[in-house]
Design a protein with these regions (language model features):
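Recognition helix of helix-turn-helix/homeodomain-like DNA-binding domains
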Residues: 24-40
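Short, charged recognition helix plus adjacent turn
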Residues: 7, 11, 50, 60-70
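Short, basic-rich loop-to-helix N-cap that marks the start of a DNA-contacting helix
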Residues: 37-50, 66-68
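DNA major-groove recognition helix of helix-turn-helix/homeodomain DNA-binding modules
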Residues: 24, 43-58
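Hydrophobic side chains within well-formed alpha-helices
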Residues: 1, 5, 55-56
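Short basic helix-loop element that most often maps to the first helix and adjoining turn
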Residues: 3-22, 47
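Conserved hydrophobic/aromatic packing and binding residues within compact polymer-binding modules
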Residues: 5, 19, 30-33, 59
């Protein structure tokens, strides 16, 4: 998961601070998620998936396809 979170943020040219400001998720937690030191709780996964427009399965590296099935 850590690779997809970092990849998504970098693809959008976001800093952790700007992501914090847009999602309300603390920068320190974002850093830990990206480094694989913590796993985001379900509520945080939902926020990140909606923000990035990807599926939770993509965030969790369960699929290589970022598309959301609607």
């Amino acid at each position: 998961m850590k690779n997809n979170l970092l990849k998504l943020r970098k693809e959008r040219n976001l800093t952790q601070l700007s992501l914090q400001m847009q999602t309300g998720i603390e920068q320190a937690l974002l850093s830990k998620f990206e480094r694989g030191e913590r796993i985001p709780p379900t509520e945080t996964l939902v926020v990140l998936a909606e923000f990035y427009g990807v599926s939770i399965d993509y965030l969790l590296c369960r699929t290589e396809k970022p598309e959301v099935n609607r």
